[in-house]
Amino acid sequence: MQNIPKIWCIPQLFVTLQSKTKNKMKQEINPKDTNRAIAFELWTKSPMPMVTLTKTFDVTRLYKVSRRHGLKFNMLLCWCIGKAASTIDEFYMLPKDGKLYKYDRMAINVIADNVKGGLSFCDVAVTDDLEAFNANYLHLTETISQTCQDILDDEAIIVGTSAVTGTELDSITNQYNGIFNNPFLAWGRYRKGWLKTTLPISFQFHHAQMDGSHAARFLEELQRTIDTIAV
């Protein structure tokens, strides 16, 4: 893992970003008034409505940016995920308990090891500002790691993530428990080659939320975002 310098302005950036989004919230909408009407009818009562796609990404640029600027690789990938997902309208709708909700903002759920040897969770608000996202990411992950208290945003659409970096993985299929319908991405350790670094990423989503075409568009946008990230 890379050593990350402490950023003294983290709390200020965190408060500023939170204040911009605190008044936005989710609302229930009529599925028949959306482009998900048919999918909602077909898949909300399905015993297994989740779909998983796996794509191998070229993360060479992320690896170089991480090493060159001393930024966490996982943070950079989470920022790219949020930036790509925010361009897909379907990400802002989510079925839950037989209803469809629309959200005004998005956050990336990050898992961190805590001081008690367990796991803690935090939701990092999505923003186009990489510096602000990095500051919030570091502040929140450090806080939950030390306090063992989750910091979650119930009013944002949450894109779950899980980095299983203890080994290289070809694909990850997450459990479906019928409670969490949120889109979810997971990956293992990246693979460093002579000319490029690659990383298979698995993307799980609820079929009532989006179709395969939307998911494919997101994965393509994620690769473009990775290729063009600038610091």
Residue ranges and their predicted role:
Residues 114-169:
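Helical lid/core segments from catalytic subdomains that handle acyl or acyl-like groups
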Residues 6, 13-16:
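Short, positively charged and aromatic/hydrophobic N-terminal segments
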Residues 91-123, 155:
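Small-residue-rich loop/turn and linker elements
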Residues 26-72:
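N-terminal beta-alpha "docking/capping" segments at the starts of catalytic domains
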Residues 62-87, 199-218:
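Acyl activation and transfer enzymes in specialized metabolism, enriched
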